[in-house]
């Protein structure tokens, strides 16, 4: 099974991922990220990449609206693009409430705090994550969203993995990585 944690662009990548999802629907999970929100993708280049085709843009956003914001893999690992907003049951996570799950970031500071990313965005600390994991019988969380130097970063004593798979994002010189989950183990590979 392949799980991708959002920000599925440029168009060529998106096209390939949709093809894989059609070919292997039970083995590919595409999660919604902040670039799959209309409020973000119109100004981040998607509309331009579609040659300002309003109909195609609307249809593509309908697909994004149908995408899940989170998934659990191997029965113990919560996957999401951004983060969490507070300890909630998995059944309380909805597509209509996607914002924190595509925007929030982990922080060394405990609790829920304002994020430097902007208005309405928050950070969550180790205490919040541990309570969330315990409430849902989970062991770890894998998320994307944040550029990290080597393509991945472990947080909170190995309870959270930030994974980034795009090289040199925005000219930052960062590395890229992927994770392979088998059973309870996570193998990391730098690209």
Identify the meaning behind each predicted range.
Residues 1-191:
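Feature recognizes metal-dependent phosphohydrolase scaffolds
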């Amino acid at each position: 099974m392949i799980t991708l944690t959002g920000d599925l662009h440029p168009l060529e990548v998106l096209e390939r991922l949709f093809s894989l999802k059609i070919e292997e629907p039970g083995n590919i999970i595409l999660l919604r990220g902040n670039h799959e929100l209309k409020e973000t993708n119109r100004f981040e280049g998607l509309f331009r990449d579609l040659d300002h085709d309003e109909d195609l843009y609307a249809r593509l956003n309908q697909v994004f609206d149908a995408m899940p914001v989170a998934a659990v893999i191997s029965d113990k690992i919560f996957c999401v693009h951004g983060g969490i907003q507070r300890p909630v049951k998995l059944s309380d996570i909805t597509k209509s409430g996607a914002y924190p799950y595509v925007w929030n970031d982990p922080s060394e500071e405990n609790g829920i705090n304002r994020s430097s990313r902007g208005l309405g965005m928050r950070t969550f600390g180790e205490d919040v994550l541990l309570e969330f994991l315990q409430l849902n019988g989970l062991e770890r969380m894998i998320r994307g969203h944040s550029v990290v130097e080597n393509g991945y970063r472990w947080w909170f004593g190995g309870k959270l993995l930030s994974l980034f798979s795009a090289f040199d994002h925005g000219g930052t010189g960062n590395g890229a990585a992927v994770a392979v989950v088998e059973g309870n183990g996570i193998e990391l590979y730098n690209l």
